[in-house]
């Protein structure tokens, strides 16, 4: 019997993985110092240092505002050195925003993954233009799992200055971790967190989950499973007439081109998924706890509605 509550609209639908839940339960025993001066935050910080093979790491939580976003042209969801130059060199007058930081998403919003050499090429371009490189790693774990690369190889060793390491989509309840690979960029960061209302008094309950996720490589195990389920779905629907894969499956998302009647029929059958990627486009996301049987049920329904 499969869990009928499992859906494919978002990897945020899933709950908390057992490793994270266990760490939070342990952190709930006794008293600890507040505002990040606790043993769990120290352990999490040290775990990040080990994982990324560096001593320059940050702490959980980040918030910023007031920035002007300039959207770059992409290829399969990925920014290129050429598209960065197009924006950075477009205008130099005071009436145009002055670019300061390039942000790339790993894995991207369409499920593609930047290779180390692609990140390095972007980093080299950023240095040439006097820009910093920030990586939005909401699904960073999935990228590592797909490529078989270490976190260091996909971040600072490839030229990333700051990484936002996501945990929410990989078994945590809340929380992202900010890792600074250039110590100078982290100066006064604690003050900015405080000013932005991001300094939790009981920080251990944001830090302990990271200990549970990082120790014994639970983060990698869960992201591998989510990726596997996405690959399985892709394989199961690959021979269905009329179904087209919109983007290569490299992380935990599958983007399919379906007929509009099929999209409506799937929705009528109770399946939840997003259709923001164009007419007939559908996104199906797999999670750390997605059941293979549920993937097969979805694939079977896609086959039925496409043949109707």
What are these regions (language model features)?
Residues 2-269, 275-290, 298-306:
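Conserved PLP-enzyme active-site core in the AAT-like
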